[in-house]
Amino acid sequence: SWDGFIAGFNQEFLIFFCIGVFAQLVDGTLGMGYGATSTSFLLAYGIPPAISSTGVHVAEMFTTGASAISHHRFGNINKKLVRHLLIPGVLGSIAGAYLLSDVIDGDAIKPFIAVYMIGLAVIIIRKAMQKNIIKKKTKRLNILASFGGFMDAVGGGGWGPIVTSTLLGRGRNPRYTIGSVNAAEFAVAFASGVTFMLFGGIQGWQVIIGLILG
């Protein structure tokens, strides 16, 4: 009912809004970490993994779309790199979203997601401290993108920390790497968000709206 909808904008909604704001600050500073940051706080608050990941990816449909447009406008996108990442990343994210929403027991994998989030935190911190790196040829981009998309959907985040950090670690140009990975992330987030809604329904609208507004 309308009264129930209005009642949903309570203190809990404010918490989700603040999580969205903080996650966006982290992502804006490092060029990655929105999903990992927001999912970590949502899980700590007691939100189930499937609802957390659904909320994050639906919110990312908006945030990554805006980011992709911005990077395109400033000429930060390597179209060849985007092509290599796009389809494998989308397929991996669809597979991960389907498993989490319709196959895997969310409570059973909570400990594994917690460990995964700690790993992502280490990756993000390392990326922030990286100095000049000798460029090396990056092989098997399709496998990297598939793995990044899959783990992003199951864990609620990780596309940036996994894909961007790996590419930067091989000495790729930061400007084009971050721009291209962020552009591909829009399709990855859109695919997983739609998959979550198809197989799990629209759950936790407070989480979704709070993160989007944040």
Language-model features, listed with the residues they occupy:
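Hydrophobic alpha-helical segments of membrane proteins
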Residues: 154, 158, 189-194
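Small-residue-rich packing faces within the transmembrane alpha-helices of Major Facilitator Superfamily
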Residues: 61-64, 114, 118-121, 186-190
